[in-house]
Each structure stands twice: as structure tokens, then as C-alpha cells.
């Protein structure tokens, strides 16, 4: 009788354990956060990770090797004094600074990349826009939108937006060039942050993307 009880106890235990293992795991962002919402053109957009544990990327971000140049590995700090952040810091920025209109998320890639999909809530300002080589026309139009005020021939950045800038990933130089160009224009380094992981790391972690409407 005693052996029968022990057998039944173990049977029930392993049945329970098997049922727990068969339950589809929940894939959160961190231990507490499952998802969050950003505003895109006045409409809410839910940001979350792919809930399929077997999910694999099928796009170009699965590639490990690209010709260098131009696709060379970028330094952790593109410009001295610029802070580099990871995904959780980016998400905090999206939840707090972006939602309160204190900051903007900038996709520094060329439009053809941006149109394929971007991090939800990002706006596209190609790195070349900030280059003085392209003349002052673009700069004079873009910087005021970022909160800068032109006084004579100089810019006042005291009320300029805080920015997080990204591109395709650690092998892409577009964000690095955008940051370098902004700093040359006088944009305060403390108001610029670099998300080095870019689109590749964002998608490797299973985060969904937003495809801008044509």
C-alpha cells in the first residue's frame, strides 16, 4: 500500500511537471514589462516581443558578414562624449521622454531603409541632412524642428530636443555620421544618445517594427 501511494505521488508530480513544461512560455521585455504603447501619428502602437520561442529572422539581418568598407564595425562611442545605450535604456526613453515630448527617436538611415520598417515611433532624418556639404538649406529647415533657434549665423540649442539616434546596427555607419555632423553643427553632446544595436539587435530580440505608410 505504501509503495502504491509513493508511486501515485510521483506520477501526479511528473504529470504536473510535464503540464507546466508544455505551457507556452510568456516572452516579456524584462521581468515586469510585457509590452508598452507609443504614439504614431496620433494612434497608439503596441510594442512587444515575438511570442513564438521558435521564431527566426528571415530578412537581411541574419547576415554575419558584409563588405568593409563601407559596412565596417562601428566604435562603441562614435564621438567622444556621446552616450551609447542598450534596448532597456531605449525603451525607457520611448516611455518617458518621447511620451512627454521631451525627446525624439531618430532613424538616421536613408529613406529606402526606413520604408522597409523602423523602430516604432522613430522619425526618419537621413544622416546626410546634417552635413554642411549639402548646404545650409536642409539644416535651416531641420534644426528648428528639433528645437534649435538660429541667432545670426549661430544656433542656440538650449531648448533643443534630446535625441536617440540609430541605424541598421553595429556594422552601419549612418548613425555615427549623423552624430558626428550634429556635433560639428554645435548640437550639445549631452542631448544625443546612440543606440548602437540598431535595427538588427532590435529584431534579433524579437521586437516588432513599424512600416511607414507610403
Place the predicted regions along the sequence by residue.
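Short, solvent-exposed loop/turn and secondary-structure capping segments
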Residues: 116-120, 137, 175-179, 205-206
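Flexible, polar/low-complexity N-terminal or interdomain linker segments that lie immediately upstream
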Residues: 19-116
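Catalytic cysteine-centered active loop of the rhodanese-like fold, especially the PTP/DSP P-loop
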Residues: 143-200
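Bacterial N-terminal signal peptides
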Residues: 7-15
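Positively charged, proline/Ser/Thr-rich regional signature most characteristic
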Residues: 71-162, 212
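Positively charged n-region of N-terminal signal peptides that target proteins for export
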Residues: 1-6
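Solvent-exposed loop/turn segments at secondary-structure junctions
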Residues: 110-113, 129-132, 169-173, 198-202
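Active-site neighborhoods of enzymes that stabilize oxyanions during catalysis
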Residues: 205-214
